[in-house]
Amino acid sequence: MGAIMVVGTTSHAGKSIMAAVICRMLKRKGYQVTPFKGQNMALNAYVTNAGDEIGHAQAVQAWAAGLEPRVEMNPILLKPQGDMTSQVILNGKAVGRTQAADYYRDYFDRGWQAITTALVTLQQEFDWIVCEGAGSPAEINLKHRDLTNMRVAKHLNAPTLLVADIDRGGVFAHIVGTLELLDPDERALIKGFVINKFRGQRSLLESGITWLEERTGIPVVGVIPWLEHSLPAEDSLDLFERRRTKPNAEVTIAVIRLPRISNFTDFDPLEAEPSVRLQFVGPNQPLGQPDAVIVPGSKTTISDLQQLQVSSMADQLRAYSQAGGMVLGICGGLQMLGQTISDPMGTEGPPGEFAGLGLLPLQTTMSGDKITRQRQAQITLPSDCSALGEDARTIQGYEIHQGQTQVLQPEAVQAWFDDPALGVVSCNHRILGTYLHGIFNNGPWRRVWLNQLRAQKNLLPLPLAIPNYKVYRDHMLDQVTDAIAPYLNLQPFLGKA
């Protein structure tokens, strides 16, 4: 068994993509390879086939390795619920909420046990483990309780790749400063540097690279050019920074930028559609006149709903709906579209009942039980069924939510799926809500929905005979790997591999 650790000088240096690319490169060499991240903090989650919740970035890395995601790849997931509070997902299951000051006191030992147990399992099954760190490995105020970076590297005696983002400036200072703050035994594991997101000619960097290698004795094993790609973003900062302009887009879809937006990977398939422009609209921004509005998932549904209510967005959404606009709510967005959300046990915060947006006759009650499961459902909505062939009416996705939703006026809505609890549609088909994450991954249905928007503008329909998004995602993983591999020398890490 071999192991490689990928750490970064900062957050957003490109660790996740680099780890995915290394997984793909090793897979191409014929090795059994698995990704691993001991602890992730993210609001983008994925549910494995076993019903376990892990970071979505590790799911992407698993697909890069040709694997189905599993809980051992990310035994700890922290999902921020407020500035100082997170939900703790341990071995795929929610085990509680914690304050930042209490987390390491309450979970450090349990967390390290989960990490080492997962590593033992993976070591027994795979030729290579590609580990990803988090943030920076040199946060000196946190190093003594860091579960993710050099503690894992030392445990595996893993040669470590240090990735730095030159696009942010100060790349040489970041690299040297990080090395200076590492302990000697940690520094000894750093076997190469990657300068990521470089724009320009490498010759302009040569003097700096020579200086860096002479000063540190460590080679620069890669200078990676700036890449445009559509692989899922790690968090919302990445997401909003990289949105591409599409001057020739024919359909505009507004996504409400909730303060605690979660699972925004739901929209990657829409971003990949050449004819679709996505706009992320904050609660205090003008909504405008998009062709459709999506209210996405949220880690703190009630708090984000209240933000919509105190801002202008709730009124804007109601006015948009009354004017005939199409609104789709996903997971927490579905809950917000209803009449009320009650939280009698204080699952998300102070107990109480809270007014929803009132666009669907629904009532949601929060509870301590969390639903995490893969789902396969049959579309039963007549308008969708008439457009889809029988084979394309089966769609796949996953649920991650707390709370149960009831329909208050059954005559005012139609069931969207063969399981009515998964989603409903208003009788005029302009307001839709579903608990199903990943619904846009289903290519034919995505095109049916987009064609409804196109028909509003007298645009020709898009063809429905397309594969699901996972085929496109796999193609993108190949493209990104093909773009990075020529600039990345892994021999110092792989030896004879």
UniProtKB/Swiss-Prot annotation:
Location of the GATase cobBQ-type domain: 250-445
One of the GO biological process terms: cobalamin biosynthetic process
Disulfide bonding pattern of the chain: none
GO molecular function: ABC-type vitamin B12 transporter activity; catalytic activity
Domain of life according to the entry: Bacteria
Pathway the protein acts in: Cofactor biosynthesis; adenosylcobalamin biosynthesis
Active site: C331, H437
This protein's UniProt keywords: Cobalamin biosynthesis, Glutamine amidotransferase
Family: Belongs to the CobB/CobQ family. CobQ subfamily.
HAMAP family listed in its UniProt record: CobQ
Role, per record: Catalyzes amidations at positions B, D, E, and G on adenosylcobyrinic A,C-diamide. NH(2) groups are provided by glutamine, and one molecule of ATP is hydrogenolyzed for each amidation.
Name this protein carries in UniProt: Cobyric acid synthase
Native source organism of the sequence: Acaryochloris marina (strain MBIC 11017)
Top-level taxonomy: Bacteria, Bacillati, Cyanobacteriota, Cyanophyceae, Acaryochloridales
Gene: cobQ
